[in-house]
Structure formats: structure tokens, C-alpha cells
């Protein structure tokens, strides 16, 4: 997937738009050879590892680490989507379209379960 923005075009730490962030992650992965040397399965395994770190941060009440964990999982998923020539935005839109009218119930412990 070709980078839409050069990493140097955006100041570090400034709030970027969704599209800028996707392009920056894409360019970062491209410049480090991830698209050429890795594969979708490896990116999913990395995402699972990052999800474990996110869960660990949540359990320990480490808010900054949890935010970083969410970002790390998203980076892996953006790269995964890039390898599949998918738009992560389209994937999210597809998922929302599927759940938006979903009915279900809340289980004890706060998990929403869809109706059959």
C-alpha cells in the first residue's frame, strides 16, 4: 500500500486527522520494510500480543499504557488491512452497519450478547 503522506509532513505530537494517521502508519510500515518482509498472519499475531499488553494495562489501572495499547493494536490492524488492500475505515463501517440495529441483552459483568 503506497503511503499517502510523508512522515515528515506532520509534526510529532500534533493531533492528526484519521486519514493522516492511517497514512503515517502506512508510510512508517513501508519505510521499515514491513509490507515486504511480513505477512497478514504475522500482523494478526502481533495484534494479539499487543491486545494482551492492553488487557494487562487495563487490569493494573494504567490509563496511559492502556491508551498506548489501543494505539498499538490499531497500528497492527492498519498494517494488516494494508496487506490485504482493505481500508480499515471500510472494515469499521461494515462492522457498524452489521451491529447498529442489533438487539440483545446485557449479561452480569457488562457483556452485551446479541439475540439469536
Regions found by a protein language model. Give the residues of each.
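Flexible "arm" and connector segments at domain edges
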Residues: 2-70, 74-116
Amino acid at each position: 500500500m503506497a503511503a499517502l503522506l510523508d512522515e515528515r509532513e506532520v509534526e510529532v505530537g500534533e493531533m492528526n486527522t484519521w486519514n493522516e494517521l492511517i497514512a503515517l502508519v502506512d508510510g512508517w510500515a513501508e519505510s521499515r520494510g514491513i509490507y515486504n518482509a511480513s505477512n497478514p498472519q504475522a500482523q494478526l499475531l502481533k495484534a494479539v500480543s499487543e491486545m494482551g499488553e492492553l488487557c494487562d494495562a487495563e487490569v493494573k489501572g494504567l490509563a496511559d499504557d492502556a491508551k498506548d495499547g489501543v494505539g498499538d493494536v490499531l497500528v497492527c490492524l492498519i498494517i494488516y488491512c494494508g496487506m490485504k488492500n482493505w481500508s480499515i475505515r471500510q472494515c469499521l463501517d461494515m462492522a457498524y452497519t452489521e451491529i447498529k440495529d442489533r438487539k440483545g441483552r446485557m449479561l452480569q459483568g457488562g457483556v452485551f450478547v446479541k439475540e439469536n
